[in-house]
Amino acid sequence: MGPVELLHMSVFSQSFSPCGRYLAAGNNYGEIAVFSLSAALSPDASERSQKPILNFTAHDGPVFSLLSTESHLLSAGNGEISAWSWAELIKKSTKAAWTRKPNYETSLEIPEINAMIINPKDNNLIVGGGDNNIHIMDMETGTFKSVLKGHTDYIHCLSFKEREGEILSGGEDGAVRIWDSRTNRPVHCIEVFKYEECARPQFGKWISCLATDSDWMLCGGGPSLSLWHLRSMSPTSVFPLSGCQREAVSYQDLIMSVGEGPYVSHCLHGGTVKAQIPCSPSSLNTLALNLKNTEHRVMTVGGSSHQIDVFTNFSYRALSLSF
């Protein structure tokens, strides 16, 4: 890859291996790079250990979503999902285990897939993207068995509430929709942009990030990043972050968020911004926490750069991996 391509590279997605020792990242050129965290974090790490052990073209279009199961890395490109065995990737083999396409309404349509999550209760893969619908695939058989319709524009993000078995979806239409995964029926619809404390009409109404656990939901995008109590369906905290947020996670007593601007924002649940930690890319698309492996417990962020920043404690950048 030449200097011009590197200059215009964006990292859209990342996922840690089941063992927590490797990181996969997807970019706008359809490539997936696999990095060895154990090599990059070792005391005798060199510049070479910050480069991928493997880099391959997985899709024609950008890799907007990556997701790891117990054995495979799932990647989503334009209209298709591919699975790669982690054991084979580590051996530098890049043959896809399988590729599947959701049942789109027209054969001319090749919508991008923006988000994938697993429903651990029934081992279903939940997929959302450019056709405004949620597609559900049985991971055992590889068949798409249901479609959830309700969004009027494309879906950016998905989350799963395990206790209630509920799917949450956020879209360009400004709605967060909550679905019962047992019946595939809609349960609630929250139009975040209609709440005065969250609305930012100058940025639009789209919802680009979503995270949830039992009673709480984090969401943001055009509207301000906000924390919602799902029993009362009301925002309890609105975070005064200037740009649009693209990914947010809750970890212990912190909310960590990335979006426009070269930093990771650390927020407290009450609504205050505690710190903003500088990063290499000028804006960020993806933030991931590696909690599977205590030895390699890191936060990684990627965005409008060929570099992925690695934080060993979440308050400063330890190193940067690069495509």
From Swiss-Prot:
GO cellular component terms, A-Z: nuclear speck; THO complex; transcription export complex
Ranges of the WD repeats in the UniProt entry: 6-45, 58-96, 108-147, 150-189, 200-238, 279-321
Pfam families reported for this sequence: WD40
Record flagged with keyword 4Fe-4S: no
GO annotation (BP), single: mRNA export from nucleus
PROSITE patterns: WD_REPEATS_1, WD_REPEATS_2, WD_REPEATS_REGION
Top-level taxonomic group: Eukaryota
InterPro entries (alphabetical): THOC6, WD40/YVTN_repeat-like_dom_sf, WD40_repeat_CS, WD40_repeat_dom_sf, WD40_rpt
One Gene Ontology term of the molecular function aspect: RNA binding
Record's keyword terms, sorted: Apoptosis, Developmental protein, mRNA processing, mRNA splicing, mRNA transport, Nucleus, Repeat, RNA-binding, Transport, WD repeat
SUPFAM superfamilies cross-referenced by the UniProt entry: WD40 repeat-like (SSF50978)
Subcellular location, record wording: Nucleus; Nucleus speckle
Role this protein plays: Component of the THO subcomplex of the TREX complex which is thought to couple mRNA transcription, processing and nuclear export, and which specifically associates with spliced mRNA and not with unspliced pre-mRNA. Plays a key structural role in the oligomerization of the THO-DDX39B complex.
Subunit organization: Component of the THO subcomplex, which is composed of thoc1, thoc2, thoc3, thoc5, thoc6 and thoc7. Component of the transcription/export (TREX) complex at least composed of alyref/thoc4, ddx39b, sarnp/cip29, chtop and the THO subcomplex.
Family statement drawn from the similarity comment of this UniProt entry: Belongs to the WD repeat THOC6 family.
Protein name: THO complex subunit 6 homolog
